[in-house]
Amino acid sequence: VGVDGLAWLKEVKKETGMYVSTEVATSKHVYECLKAGIDILWIGARATANPFAMQEIADALKGVDIPVFVKNPVNPDLELWIGALERINNAGLKRLAAIHRGFSRVASSHPEPADHLRSQPHRW
């Protein structure tokens, strides 16, 4: 939908008073969202996994006070996720949330019953 969708979110905000949020993956997305008055931004798993994309987004957010949700990368790489959060924090943003959506599993020669699930059930 792109930029046209931002107008719809703006209308939702006006009619309901609700906060509106959308995903950003580039600096252009950030600028368009800020221009449209989006209240909360989130960064998806693929952008989180790309330090170059994260730095571009962080640079676009310098001097802005907006909540940012950062989803975990698809693969279980905690340092990559922390690095993404640090880049946003180093740009001056303080209202951050780490959103865990689960990790993909590498194919195994010993498949588990729940291998089709993105977030594996915890084993007690």
Tell me what each language-model feature is.
Residues 12-19, 122-124:
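A structural motif corresponding to the C-terminal end of an alpha-helix
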Residues 16-26, 30, 38-53, 66-78, ...:
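Catalytic beta/alpha-barrel core
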Residues 54-124:
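Catalytic alpha/beta core domains of metabolic enzymes, predominantly
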Residues 12-15, 36, 44, 60, ...:
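Mid-sequence acidic-hydrophobic segments that form the walls
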